Amino acid sequence: MRTLTILTAVLLVALQAKAEPLQAEDEPLQAKAYEADAQEQRGANDQDFAVSFAEDASSSLRALGSTRAFTCHCRRSCYSTEYSYGTCTVMGINHRFCCL
């Protein structure tokens, strides 16, 4: 029984390792398509939007004395080095708000 559990865990890790590079390769293609759509619609509805951080994220960084700024993007899914700080809406579609 223990051997079956270990083999299953190894199989799941191998599948996950194989799936992550596919997602990383697909991300630039999605970004290019998104940029093309955004450029087409930029002339039709030129709108500004504000980004604000929840108090817990920014105040905790200030309390630690960090001088590093957040770099955030609105994406379908966050990279492994990013954290999701909520959601954002672009052209009526909800995405994750991913920050480094």
Swiss-Prot record:
GO terms for molecular function: protein homodimerization activity. GO terms for biological process: antibacterial humoral response; antimicrobial humoral immune response mediated by antimicrobial peptide; cellular response to lipopolysaccharide; defense response to fungus; defense response to Gram-negative bacterium; defense response to Gram-positive bacterium; disruption of plasma membrane integrity in another organism; innate immune response in mucosa. This is Defensin-6. Host-defense peptide that contributes to intestinal innate immunity and mediates homeostasis at mucosal surfaces by forming higher-order oligomers that capture bacteria and prevent microbial invasion of the epithelium. After binding to bacterial surface proteins, undergoes ordered self-assembly to form fibril-like nanonets that surround and entangle bacteria and thereby prevent bacterial invasion across the epithelial barrier. The keyword Nucleotide-binding does not apply. Residues 20-68 form a propeptide. It is found in: Secreted; Cytoplasmic vesicle, Secretory vesicle. One of its GO terms (cellular component) is extracellular space. Disulfide bonds join C72-C99, C74-C88, C78-C98. Homodimer. Self-assembles into higher-order oligomers termed nanonets, fibril-like structures that entrap microbes. Self-assembly into nanonets seems to protect against proteolytic digestion in duodenal fluid. Interacts with Y.enterocolitica invasin and S.typhimurium fliC/flagellim; the interaction creates an anchoring site for progressive DEFA6 self-assembly into nanonets. It comes from Pan troglodytes (Chimpanzee). Residues 1-19 form the signal peptide. Proteolytically cleaved by trypsin at Arg-68; the propeptide is stored in the tissue of the small intestine and the mature peptide is found in the luminal fluid; cleavage may occur during or after release into the lumen. The N-terminal propeptide region suppresses self-assembly and renders DEFA6 propeptide unable to agglutinate bacteria and protect human epithelial cells from bacterial invasion. Under reducing conditions, naturally present in the gut owing to the low redox potential or enzymatically generated by the thioredoxin system, the disulfide bridges are opened leading to a conformational change of DEF6, thereby changing its antimicrobial spectrum. The reduced form exhibits inhibitory activity against anaerobic bacteria, in contrast to the minimal antimicrobial activity of the disulfide-linked oxidized form. The formation of higher-order nanonets and bacterial entrapment is independent of the redox state. Its main location: secreted. Pfam families: Defensin_1 (PF00323), Defensin_propep (PF00879). Belongs to the alpha-defensin family. Keywords: Antibiotic, Antimicrobial, Cytoplasmic vesicle, Defensin, Disulfide bond, Fungicide, Immunity, Innate immunity, Secreted, Signal.
